[in-house]
């Protein structure tokens, strides 16, 4: 008997609903359970999603449910919480931790033994506490981390160079937030080092400063939120891409929030790094070379992670 790919999503707001739609449109799962603090919303989204069935790559079953239904899933996506205009992601911490405490221990107690994928901000910190609350191995608790930020960097570099973003390899590292850094020194365009490409194409980079491009990536979320009150499409695709890599055992290198255990000289917390993603979740973290500026920026981001983990611990949710 073929195995059914089952996904649960907790938190069906702008982000959760678009994660659901992205996974359905890409044929990532066969069964989906939606859960929200407002049950009527989850039910309505489930019906709305079912109305897309005749347009999907293959048949899928979508329904609303609770803890017992979620416990039977292979992957649970956590997208609870909200972000308002001008709010720093780290200012969401207490509310986000209270939200995950309300269901993570219960779904594990009910028998869930799959993989958690966290989107809820501040994602690196929340992912850390999802692991603490669940007691799961570090590889089976993953955050979307700098996955979307890296996609934004690739888009911006594509706009500057007029080259397809799919042949650009470039990563944002560290916090999914204001201290993230662009790893320009390891970036490539179809195998050509990005910094070498800059030197041989000075006309394309006239007046372009890498520090400005980096800040543009960081500002993108706030610009979107300022205009439409939320981000949803990009993160929906980021989540879908990550879940697909798990289900298909793709062993793709994807930027995500992964638990450091000596990599990059750090241990004991989650942050945005490239990792090999397969059926076991995070199979391996890849360590990219960092220049002096990038190393300092990464160290600063790690300091932020450690600081806010301590803040999170002060709330005594575990």
UniProtKB/Swiss-Prot annotation:
Catalytic site positions: 176 (proton acceptor)
InterPro entries from the UniProt entry: L-lactate/malate_DH, L-lactate_DH, L-lactate_DH_AS, Lactate/malate_DH_C, Lactate/malate_DH_N, Lactate_DH/Glyco_Ohase_4_C, NAD(P)-bd_dom_sf
Record GO terms (molecular function): L-lactate dehydrogenase activity
Record-listed NAD(+) binding positions: 15, 36, 41, 102, 119-121, 144
An example Gene Ontology biological process: lactate metabolic process
Leading EC class: oxidoreductase
Location(s) in or outside the cell: Cytoplasm
Keyword Ribonucleoprotein appears in the UniProt entry: no
Pfam families, per the entry: Ldh_1_C, Ldh_1_N
GO cellular component: cytoplasm
Main location: cytoplasm
Keywords recorded for this protein, A-Z: Cytoplasm, NAD, Oxidoreductase
Keyword check for Oxidoreductase: yes
Family: Belongs to the LDH/MDH superfamily. LDH family.
HAMAP family: Lactate_dehydrog
Family matches, as NCBIfam families: L-LDH-NAD
Subunit relationships: Homotetramer.
Role according to the record: Catalyzes the conversion of lactate to pyruvate.
Record protein name field: L-lactate dehydrogenase
Species: Fusobacterium nucleatum subsp. nucleatum (strain ATCC 25586 / DSM 15643 / BCRC 10681 / CIP 101130 / JCM 8532 / KCTC 2640 / LMG 13131 / VPI 4355)
